[in-house]
């Protein structure tokens, strides 16, 4: 009989509305994403970048440790030897659709050449736009060098 009266007076609906009104006047916990952005952790792993030294020379020494450690096999490197005996990459491709953003490539790099930057807004309509070549990775590194250097400096004691 009590269940019948509860359903007759729409007890569940009234209880739900009271709960809604309780939270209606509390401060919001969500953000309006495209217009407001939450702070990013210094350990955030976003879009990849290749860094350069201060003199403009690329840091990558073509040791291929990042290619070997990548669990998704998203990195492809080809290298040639220079006249001075050092090795440099001729091809450095990352397939961002395969990448799982684990950060192992960044941890394996002995010269901090490959890093994951602060950008997380790099969606694309085509698959080919998400295959990054060496030039695009170097452009990303040039664009975010100050942010990347401060991020690596903050995280240095934990590495």
From Swiss-Prot:
<dbReference type="GO" id="GO:0005506">
    <property type="term" value="F:iron ion binding"/>
</dbReference>
<dbReference type="InterPro" id="IPR010226">
    <property type="entry name" value="NADH_quinone_OxRdtase_chainI"/>
</dbReference>
<comment type="subunit">
    <text>NDH-1 is composed of 14 different subunits. Subunits NuoA, H, J, K, L, M, N constitute the membrane sector of the complex.</text>
</comment>
<dbReference type="GO" id="GO:0009060">
    <property type="term" value="P:aerobic respiration"/>
</dbReference>
<feature type="domain" description="4Fe-4S ferredoxin-type 1">
    <location>
        <begin position="51"/>
        <end position="80"/>
    </location>
</feature>
<feature type="binding site">
    <location>
        <position position="70"/>
    </location>
    <ligand>
        <name>[4Fe-4S] cluster 2</name>
    </ligand>
</feature>
<dbReference type="GO" id="GO:0005886">
    <property type="term" value="C:plasma membrane"/>
</dbReference>
<keyword id="KW-0997">Cell inner membrane</keyword>
<feature type="binding site">
    <location>
        <position position="105"/>
    </location>
    <ligand>
        <name>[4Fe-4S] cluster 2</name>
    </ligand>
</feature>
<keyword id="KW-1003">Cell membrane</keyword>
<feature type="domain" description="4Fe-4S ferredoxin-type 2">
    <location>
        <begin position="90"/>
        <end position="119"/>
    </location>
</feature>
<feature type="binding site">
    <location>
        <position position="60"/>
    </location>
    <ligand>
        <name>[4Fe-4S] cluster 1</name>
    </ligand>
</feature>
<dbReference type="GO" id="GO:0050136">
    <property type="term" value="F:NADH:ubiquinone reductase (non-electrogenic) activity"/>
</dbReference>
<keyword id="KW-0411">Iron-sulfur</keyword>
<protein>
    <recommendedName>
        <fullName>NADH-quinone oxidoreductase subunit I</fullName>
        <ecNumber>7.1.1.-</ecNumber>
    </recommendedName>
</protein>
<dbReference type="InterPro" id="IPR017896">
    <property type="entry name" value="4Fe4S_Fe-S-bd"/>
</dbReference>
<dbReference type="InterPro" id="IPR017900">
    <property type="entry name" value="4Fe4S_Fe_S_CS"/>
</dbReference>
<keyword id="KW-0520">NAD</keyword>
<dbReference type="GO" id="GO:0051539">
    <property type="term" value="F:4 iron, 4 sulfur cluster binding"/>
</dbReference>
<keyword id="KW-0677">Repeat</keyword>
<keyword id="KW-0479">Metal-binding</keyword>
<keyword id="KW-0408">Iron</keyword>
<comment type="similarity">
    <text>Belongs to the complex I 23 kDa subunit family.</text>
</comment>
<feature type="binding site">
    <location>
        <position position="99"/>
    </location>
    <ligand>
        <name>[4Fe-4S] cluster 2</name>
    </ligand>
</feature>
<feature type="binding site">
    <location>
        <position position="102"/>
    </location>
    <ligand>
        <name>[4Fe-4S] cluster 2</name>
    </ligand>
</feature>
<dbReference type="GO" id="GO:0048038">
    <property type="term" value="F:quinone binding"/>
</dbReference>
<keyword id="KW-0004">4Fe-4S</keyword>
<keyword id="KW-0874">Quinone</keyword>
<comment type="function">
    <text>NDH-1 shuttles electrons from NADH, via FMN and iron-sulfur (Fe-S) centers, to quinones in the respiratory chain. The immediate electron acceptor for the enzyme in this species is believed to be ubiquinone. Couples the redox reaction to proton translocation (for every two electrons transferred, four hydrogen ions are translocated across the cytoplasmic membrane), and thus conserves the redox energy in a proton gradient.</text>
</comment>
<keyword id="KW-0472">Membrane</keyword>
<feature type="binding site">
    <location>
        <position position="63"/>
    </location>
    <ligand>
        <name>[4Fe-4S] cluster 1</name>
    </ligand>
</feature>
<keyword id="KW-1278">Translocase</keyword>
<dbReference type="Pfam" id="PF12838">
    <property type="entry name" value="Fer4_7"/>
</dbReference>
<feature type="binding site">
    <location>
        <position position="109"/>
    </location>
    <ligand>
        <name>[4Fe-4S] cluster 1</name>
    </ligand>
</feature>
<feature type="binding site">
    <location>
        <position position="66"/>
    </location>
    <ligand>
        <name>[4Fe-4S] cluster 1</name>
    </ligand>
</feature>
